[in-house]
Amino acid sequence: FNPIFVSPSNHKYDIQDYDYIDPHIGKIVKDEGELLKRSEQGNLMCDPEHPNKNASRYICRVTDKENLEASNQFFADFVEEAHKRGMKVILDGVFNHCGSFNKWLDRECIYEDAPGYEKGAFVSQDSPYRSYFKFWEEIWPYNTYYDGWWGHDTLPKLNYEESDELFQYVMHIARKWVSPPYNVDGWRLDVAADLGHSAE
């Protein structure tokens, strides 16, 4: 499979949450809010700095634990059925970079006020995920000075050199999906040669 974890894109190489299967390809149980908020006059209302923060339906779909757990169960059932039919399931591991929507960074500020989530490293200097990224300036809140894969700020580079916590978390994720109840048969690593620091 191409990446199937929570992500705003169709290709899903800009992973938002490695812990859960995207409810848009899994199961949406709770579906509240609007795609984008509208004023009484019907105009779209957007925070110009963080327009995705206003997509309340998307935020509900991808942060609500009921949707996320249902999607993981859907995937576990799918893998079990694939194995019954003699098929192997290989996941695409995108561990070089994530997406700007990722809960660890949260450049889109969709987790900033979501219940049950820590502040992302873009939002807060005190984020538990700050070491997961290489920041070039000490400017918070909303620090835009971080390393992006090939310079793309929508694909924040993961900082393995300076974060043992990140390495351990990614190892946990890798083990999680090949263990019960998911039992995936293996991983294909995306841009494996780029893992770690890059010159750009």
Residue ranges: model-predicted function:
Residues N2, I21, D190-A192:
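Conserved residues at the C-terminal ends of beta-strands
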Residues I4-P181:
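Substrate-binding/active-site clefts of carbohydrate-active enzymes
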Residues D14, A199-E200:
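Residues at alpha-helix caps and immediate loop-helix transition turns in enzyme cores, especially N-
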Residues I90, R188-D190:
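Conserved beta-strand positions in the central sheet of alpha/beta enzyme cores
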Residues H97, E165, A193-A199:
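Acidic-and-aromatic substrate-binding clefts and catalytic sites of carbohydrate-active enzymes
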